[in-house]
Regions:
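Early extracytoplasmic/domain-onset interaction patches
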Residues: 16-65, 72, 396-412, 416-424
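Solvent-exposed beta-hairpin/edge-strand motifs
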Residues: 63-97, 155-172, 434-448
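A surface-exposed beta-strand-loop module
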Residues: 77-148, 179-216, 406-408, 447-448
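Long hydrophobic segments that form regular secondary structure
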Residues: 386-448
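Bacterial Sec-dependent N-terminal signal peptides
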Residues: 1-17
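Hydrophobic/aromatic-rich core segments of domains that either
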Residues: 307-397
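Cysteine-centered nucleophilic/redox motifs
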Residues: 45, 126-128, 161, 270, ...
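Secretory-pathway-linked proteins and extracytosolic
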Residues: 135-288, 323, 412, 418-436
Length: 448
């Protein structure tokens, strides 16, 4: 009986392995904050390849994006242990620096680098051992921050996250979707926080999944001070304080102001100008140390990151005479109001006012026909303003949108004629299109 059960268990383990292209033996991520403010990120993993597809499509290369201006990359190990036990180290020409795809076409960010590591000696049954350090100087936000989502394309047998800070330094952290507290120890003047997740299942390969932080184990941590102080540090840079615009930008705004268009149409024209005439650079803020360019620099370069285009949009709207506030969106369940991790920001918007009509939210990176506020349900918005004397935040709650039609109609064989009054409440309507063109109401009525 014992032999029979052992055979079943063995077959089950083999079947479970073959359900995936590979399996991580372990993944360890370690963050170390030194007393001088520098941060060392140490990554180490061991990956067993189970299919040809594993190394032909998915795991044949590793990619590390970094910024040479304040970061130094050191690869400690890139080795393959073949199925017969032979060890093959990656040769010198297996390490190649390229420009990250998201920095393509940008002069301002063409110093960014992506290290492409080509693993060699790959075959079914081989194991890739990979280990590197990424050391960051104290530039930008003057504290440690990190964000880890326990989401992997294949299973992980052992996953561990370690954070080390000098004794006396407070590490703020929040764990979501999993009840797991860190093991806290001290050694050599450092406080060591260890989250041992053990075995982690592969993420489901399905479409229409919710945001990862809403159901995967999610860890966010930071040595930041209070939320207010963090926002002060965030906005203490010329990008937020030097809002001067080039003459070419001022001329474009004056041209829009002189038109006979309504205020709503002028606002949308300015928004579309930023969206359509400036390229969108999907560069993570952490990669540029949360240091952004001024509106003038962004305008003249014809490109910008999400936050840079948002800052520019706010500056252009103010130039046109409209109120404009920059806000950052953070998932409410992630935000802890006692401290702040800028990595938790998921989007930036401009809040402006259509005179005598409504307060609206605009994106600087994609067009939308309605007020974005309903889309922000489940998020808390933070005012990003260097002149703010205290933190300003507000949570977005769900809001019903309704359409009420009252009138008299003459129903004929192939048409309906009559007069009616339409009342649309809430914000989930093609708000901007209605203000620009009354006939947009006909399209709404057609769908009722």
């Amino acid at each position: 009986m014992l032999v029979f059960l052992a055979a079943i268990a063995g077959k089950f383990c083999v079947a479970q392995e073959l359900a995936y292209d590979a399996i991580y033996n372990f993944i360890t991520k370690e963050y170390t904050l030194s007393k001088d403010g520098n941060v060392d990120y140490h990554y180490s993993s061991s990956l067993k390849l189970l299919t040809h597809q594993a190394f032909q499509r998915y795991f044949g290369e590793s990619f590390i994006v970094y910024n040479p201006e304040f970061q130094k990359l050191k690869i400690n190990k890139s080795r393959t242990i073949m199925a017969d036990g032979k060890k093959v180290d990656s040769p010198h020409n297996a390490f190649n620096e390229v420009l990250p795809g998201f920095a393509s076409g940008s002069v301002a960010y063409n110093h960014l680098r992506e290290m492409v590591v080509s693993h060699t000696g790959l075959e079914v049954g081989a194991t890739i051992e990979f280990d590197y350090n990424l050391m960051s100087q104290a530039k930008g936000m003057p504290y440690l921050m990190g964000e880890e989502i326990l989401s992997f394309p294949v299973p992980v047998e052992s996953c561990k996250i370690i954070v080390k800070v000098p004794e006396g330094t407070i590490l703020n952290y929040k764990m979501l979707n999993l009840r797991l507290s860190p093991e806290i120890t001290t050694a050599k003047g450092m406080m060591i926080y260890t989250w041992n997740f053990g075995k982690v299942e592969a993420n489901p390969h399905e479409i229409y999944m919710p945001e990862a932080s809403s159901y995967f184990p999610f860890l966010t941590f930071s040595t930041s001070p209070s939320l207010q102080r963090s926002l002060e540090l965030f906005t203490n840079q010329p990008a937020f304080t030097d809002t001067r615009l080039p003459q070419t930008a001022v001329a474009r705004i004056e041209q829009i102001k002189r038109s006979n268009s309504s205020d709503s149409k002028k606002i949308i024209q300015i928004r579309n100008l930023v969206i359509n005439e400036l390229s969108y650079l999907q560069i993570p803020s952490a990669t540029i140390a949360f240091k952004f360019r001024t509106p003038a620099e962004v305008w003249e370069s014809l490109s910008g990151t999400e936050i840079e285009k948002t800052i520019l949009l706010a500056a252009l709207l103010r130039q046109a005479g409209y109120q404009a506030d920059i806000v950052a969106s953070v998932p409410t369940h992630v935000l802890d109001t006692k401290w702040f991790n800028p990595l938790d920001i998921n989007a930036y918007y401009v809040r402006t006012e259509i005179p005598e009509i409504a307060s609206i939210y605009l994106s600087a990176i994609y067009e939308h026909p309605y007020n974005l506020l309903p889309n922000l349900y489940g998020n808390t918005l933070l005012l990003v303003d260097p002149a703010a004397e205290s933190e300003k935040k507000w949570e977005i709650y769900p809001e019903n949108s309704t359409i009420k039609v009252k009138g008299s109609f003459d129903i004929k064989s192939f048409s309906v004629e009559g007069k009616a009054e339409l009342e649309a409440t809430g914000r989930y309507h093609p708000f901007y299109r209605i203000l620009e063109n009354d006939k947009e109401i006909n399209r709404i009525l057609t769908g009722l």
